[in-house]
């Protein structure tokens, strides 16, 4: 009796880890950090574009000569395609964040494929190349999310440092959390948009970005984009 219970507990634990841990490999390959050779980090932004924050962030990145990766929501891409196009034209990577910003861990394969496909098409209609990356909202995945994304040509990306800038903790808190938490190979998660409020305030993140770049450079970090394979 003990053995079946132990097996059941292990299976449940593995399933939970696969669903809720952003970098779990239980349900397939996911890139959660860069190779730790050298002091390299990667800035990534979710839930955009946003007509207020995204241009400010792009301006800061251009001024500092930094390239980043933007995981774009399809619904927002349809509303502000000009910003999607600007992200691409300024040399940043574009990833797919789905269309609806719904947690995918309990969704059917049909729903998951539809969400990722709609997001992909919305990005393409903005006039940019097909996205090569996918990041699930909140990092939540089911056994089929990664395989469906892969079938659509998109590599699943997690992150190694989330600073909860979406909670609006203040500019200084966002900067401090990012700088203190960064390690060689960190994939840093920030937000230039709001997945639940199309007019959400991301001014704190926009104000924090140039300070983050300056502080991390002072510590010897170099900014790179994500590897495609």
Predicted regions span which residues?
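A short acidic, helix-capping loop that chelates divalent metal ions and anchors anionic groups
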Residues: 102-107, 195-199
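Catalytic grooves of carbohydrate-active enzymes
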Residues: 179-227
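Active-site beta->alpha N-cap acidic-glycine motif
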Residues: 19-105, 111, 118, 122, ...
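A cross-domain feature marking catalytic cores of carbohydrate-active enzymes
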Residues: 45-47, 72-74, 96-98, 136-138, ...
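Charged helix-capping and loop-helix junction motifs
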Residues: 111-116, 171-176, 202-209
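His/Asp/Glu-enriched short active-site or ligand-binding loop at hydrolase and phosphoryl-transfer sites
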Residues: 140, 145-181, 221-228
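Divalent metal-coordination and catalytic microenvironments
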Residues: 46, 61, 94, 134-137, ...
